[in-house]
């Protein structure tokens, strides 16, 4: 099952479209360049919370920081250091812009895509087997899904 919401960008911000595609559906949501987008999901082995924070660019997504609920996840992913901030282990890094974020959600799991005050929830579903793809593009004339 897939739940989606529309975000209206603030005045003056350059809008682009966040495109969400599954095997059966495609939807477009207005989002501002420079806005943060987070992916939040349980770790596939340990089950604890992982949050990946990106900055939206005209061409995609730039990773800004990773937030882990447990220090063993920092070690699991091979990061040399992390700071404990407000109960999360935070790794900050600037990475090249990714043009695509491919999401794979296992059964009985979910990934939340959060931007602004909105949240899209991707769950495993037999229709699209838990696969979804996020991209950024110029918005078509009608930016509704």
List the predicted regions and their residue ranges.
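Sequence contexts marking disulfide-bonded cysteines in secreted/extracellular proteins
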Residues: 6, 16-18, 138-140
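Mature, soluble, non-transmembrane domains
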Residues: 71-145
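Bacterial N-terminal signal peptides
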Residues: 1-8
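N-terminal secretory signal peptides
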Residues: 14-70
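Phenylalanine-focused residue identity feature
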Residues: 3, 29, 41, 54, ...
């Amino acid at each position: 099952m897939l739940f989606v919401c529309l975000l209206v960008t603030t005045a003056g911000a350059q809008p682009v479209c966040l495109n969400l595609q599954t095997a059966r559906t495609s939807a477009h949501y207005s989002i501002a360049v420079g806005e943060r987008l987070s992916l939040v999901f349980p770790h596939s082995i340990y089950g604890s919370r992982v949050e990946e924070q990106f900055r939206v660019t005209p061409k995609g997504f730039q990773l800004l920081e990773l937030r882990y609920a447990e220090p063993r996840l920092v070690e699991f992913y091979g990061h040399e250091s992390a700071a404990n901030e407000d109960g999360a282990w935070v790794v900050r890094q600037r990475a090249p812009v990714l043009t695509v974020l491919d999401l794979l959600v296992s059964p009985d799991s979910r990934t939340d895509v959060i931007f602004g005050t909105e949240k899209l929830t991707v769950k495993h579903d037999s229709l699209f087997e838990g696969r979804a793809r996020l991209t950024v593009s110029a918005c078509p004339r009608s930016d509704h899904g």
